[in-house]
Regions:
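Basic, flexible Lys/Arg- and Gly-enriched helix-loop patches that mediate nucleic-acid binding at interfaces
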Residues: 1-234
Length: 234
């Protein structure tokens, strides 16, 4: 959350008082004097000291879900089940960062840290996403070079270079750093291959917990939360 909002939650209700803390160098974050009230902070990732007192309350919430097929990556829907139906936490601010298609399974990152989610989806962040893919048509060695060169969709849209690891004739792992609509499926379709199964294995530094059953979720560990720190806006 923004530093000024975090200060508000911790008792500094007056904006002028918050500015005075900045001007008098009373706010220290990770050992450095902070001058930006709009920066994104979380006491689970940062050491926040105000007036020589460390603040540790009001952190954000972070979860990992193994999304099942047939579940929407949406907060609500009148007709179809959504990931939110499976989350017990009563927190309206939670949302999925980087949605998955209705039939796509795997890692879904859920948080109420809006600025973090926005920043992780920006192209300049180059957040890598890894997928397991099963195709109907057989894969070919030449497909690897095509992915590395970038592929062109109908309409002239071209992808950035991607990494394709062929596991066997019908299975592969794909790593991309973009988030175009139905991108992975369209990349294979550009090579004349239909994707039969798609599972996200990783999103940035987060890796799908193999112990999570489809539809299950858990809070991120402290180590996983800290791995997100490079994406926090300063």
């Amino acid at each position: 959350m923004r530093l000024d909002h975090y200060l508000f939650l911790n008792g500094w209700k007056d904006k002028k008082e918050c500015k005075r803390l900045i001007q008098t160098r009373k706010i220290i974050i990770d050992g450095e004097v902070e001058y930006n009230l709009s920066r994104n902070v979380d006491p689970q990732m940062h050491e926040i000291i105000v007036n020589q007192q460390q603040l540790t309350t009001f952190g954000h919430h972070y979860f990992m879900m193994n999304k099942a097929a047939g579940v929407l990556s949406a907060n609500k829907d009148e007709h179809l089940p959504t990931y939110r139906d499976l989350v017990e936490e009563k927190n309206d601010a939670l949302y999925p960062v980087g949605r998955l298609d209705f039939l796509t399974t795997g890692l879904l990152f859920i948080t109420d840290n809006g600025p973090l989610g926005i920043d992780m989806l920006k192209p300049q962040q180059h957040v890598s996403k890894t997928y397991f893919v099963e195709t109907w048509e057989p894969l070919e060695v030449s497909d690897r070079a095509a992915f590395e060169a970038g592929l062109e969709f109908i309409g002239g849209v071209r992808t950035q270079p991607a990494q394709l690891e062929i596991l066997d004739v019908h299975h592969a792992k794909v790593a991309i750093q973009e988030g175009k609509y139905h991108q992975v499926k369209k990349m294979f379709l550009a090579l004349g291959k239909k994707v039969e199964q798609l599972q996200r294995l990783s999103f940035g530094p987060l890796v799908l917990d193999e112990d999570l059953q489809p539809g299950a979720y858990r809070p991120l560990t402290q180590q996983e939360i800290l791995s997100l720190k490079p994406y926090m806006r300063k």
